[in-house]
Amino acid sequence: MPRFSVIESLCRQDGICASVCPAHVIKGPKGKTPFMRPDRQDSCIACGQCMAFCPFGAARVDVLDPSDMLPLERSKLPDAESLSMLFQSRRSIRHFKKEPVARELLQHILDETRHAPSAKNRRAVRWIMVYEPEKMRAVGDCAVEGLKLGLQNPETGPVLAEAKALIKAWGRGLDPLFRGAPHLALAVAPIGQPLAREDAVIALTYLELAALPYKVGACWAGYITGIARQYEPMQRLLCLGPDAEVRGGQLLGPIGLRPTASAPRVPFATQR
């Protein structure tokens, strides 16, 4: 289990680490050196909250590397106007350039999602990156076979016409599944993990935003996600294993067409 400690020469005994610990693992009133509560030895979730909030770098959690910490430069944070522009400019990209994204860049973008929050800091989401054209084609072919099988299900009625159109378009050499995106990122999490789907959606949203500065566009891969949850051949192709499930996905690739304005939005209804 993770263990909390302090570097006493740096500690100012201000009680901040104890006050911000969400698991109430730390005891340390002002004027005294904080320590890990004996009755909470197995409760640390290694969230790093104590390390992030300590102004003097005194807090430590043994499973977390302090060299991985980034000093926060407030001047580099977006102001309200810039942040609003980012939110309003975000659009799903469905027109991609044909060239691939460098593997190193995709890995860097994926690495940014480490900072996405997760329930109780479980960090159960992992990634499957489909990179090569041959593998993308195999995933697409498998998805179409899954759609064909789904047409035999009497409960498929509401999506029958859509599935038929997808199958027909794929057979004609069109790409309704990937929309020309050269890559696919799938967020995978354990079956039965509480709030794992929500964790995956948050991580996928971080992924989309992290890609934008590099002119890498993203589009939610709803068809592939739905098929991967139900179609065993797809699960085998992705090497999922019996205890894991695809919780969401993003198509990724160099942006072909980008928006020039925000789209109008009807305000949310708010209950007061």
Which residues make up each language-model segment?
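Acidic, surface-exposed loops and disordered segments
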Residues: 1-272
